[in-house]
Amino acid sequence: MMPKRTKFRKQQKGQFAGLSKGATFVDFGEFGMQTLERGWVTSRQIEACRIAINRYLKRRGKVWIRIFPDKSVTKKPAETRMGKGKGAPDHWVAVVRPGRILFEVANVSREDAQDALRRAAAKLGIRTRFVKRVERV
């Protein structure tokens, strides 16, 4: 997963401070996975989570991915001296802050949703929790 095109190839690292500004409630499915820590989730981690959820649920249920990796991370080649500019874009990450909903599932039982999201959480480098949908006014 990566953006089709961006205005600039390289980005600054940015700040992690604060809580998630959006996507803090389960809006599409019945159950979701919410972050408890801040960090970067790579496109490979998102794909590994998606595969883990789909393999556990087989053809039952529906899955929503609520994050998208839109930040490029650069890397310099191995055995390169310091300086000489910033490295080339290497991979893409999604910046997540506490409270962000990462994945949602619907049309499955609570136990199946919990097991599927627990398997997906093992692929991430941040702590998460299982949440269910609450009605908002």
Swiss-Prot record:
Transmembrane segments: none annotated. Coiled coil: none annotated. GO terms for molecular function: rRNA binding; structural constituent of ribosome; tRNA binding. One of its GO terms (biological process) is translation. It comes from the Bacteria. Keywords: Ribonucleoprotein, Ribosomal protein, RNA-binding, rRNA-binding, tRNA-binding. GO terms for cellular component: cytosolic large ribosomal subunit. Signal peptide: none annotated. The keyword Chloroplast does not apply. Belongs to the universal ribosomal protein uL16 family. Binds 23S rRNA and is also seen to make contacts with the A and possibly P site tRNAs. PANTHER family: 50S/60S RIBOSOMAL PROTEIN L16 (PTHR12220), LARGE RIBOSOMAL SUBUNIT PROTEIN UL16M (PTHR12220:SF13). This is Large ribosomal subunit protein uL16. The gene is rplP.
